[in-house]
């Protein structure tokens, strides 16, 4: 599985999937040139408070 998939599944298991996708959109706006995998990792960290 890809890293993005793992992050989405983990967020889903913690009931944070929708919040993850909302945060991904925010991070994309703030950092439009950041690689997608990094965007998801940053959003996951923000949502899960890690």
Question: Language-model features: where?
Answer:
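C-terminal alpha-helical interaction appendages
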Residues: 1-50
